[in-house]
């Protein structure tokens, strides 16, 4: 049995060990982009010796936002994200990002529209009605996931995790 603290090959990426800081919402974004606080947090995790640290809960499009301090993965925030990934890499760790569309859990104020999700119902965070997506909206969100993966690559991330649980 291999040791937890030995290198591990994850696809094309070699992690220095098998420990991963999983994606858990940091609530450290500003204007849906990264902050110095978010960078310092992940750099400190990397400095602590983790094999990979994962930024959490980045929406793939505006309609997928749930919280004010959440990331919205789009080209204009790539420089800030690149600052994080470069700094994490300098500490010897890999950098991942979790992407998703919050669906039934989006907020009217952050998403800028009535929440849309897989089905009609209510947002459990804000008790706001949710409209079920039309086929064209489903297709657009699927395209947004693809764009987000490319944006993550441009920002220097080594991996992408898709968040698709509990109402998303």
Q: What are these language model-derived features?
A:
Residues 53-56, 95-99, 155-168:
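Short beta-strand segments at enzyme active-site cores
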Residues 2-9, 124-127, 168:
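A generic, residue-level signal for flexible/boundary positions that often mark functional hotspots
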Residues 62-64, 106-108, 168:
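Short acidic/His/Gly/Ser-rich catalytic and metal-binding motifs that mark active-site loops
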């Amino acid at each position: 049995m291999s040791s937890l603290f030995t290198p591990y090959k994850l696809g094309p990426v070699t992690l220095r060990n098998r420990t991963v800081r999983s994606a858990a919402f940091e609530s450290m974004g500003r204007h849906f982009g990264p902050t110095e606080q978010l960078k310092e947090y992940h750099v400190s995790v990397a400095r602590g010796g983790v094999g990979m640290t994962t930024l959490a809960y980045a929406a793939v499009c505006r309609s997928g936002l749930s919280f004010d301090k959440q990331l919205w993965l789009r080209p204009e925030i790539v420089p800030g994200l690149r600052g994080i990934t470069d700094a994490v890499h300098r500490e010897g760790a890999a950098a991942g990002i979790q992407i998703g569309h919050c669906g039934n859990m989006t907020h009217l104020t952050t998403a800028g529209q009535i929440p849309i999700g897989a089905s009609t119902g209510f947002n459990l965070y804000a008790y706001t009605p949710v409209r079920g997506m039309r086929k064209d909206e489903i297709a657009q969100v699927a395209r947004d996931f693809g764009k987000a993966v490319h944006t993550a690559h441009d920002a220097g991330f080594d991996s992408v995790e898709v968040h698709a649980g509990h109402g998303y």
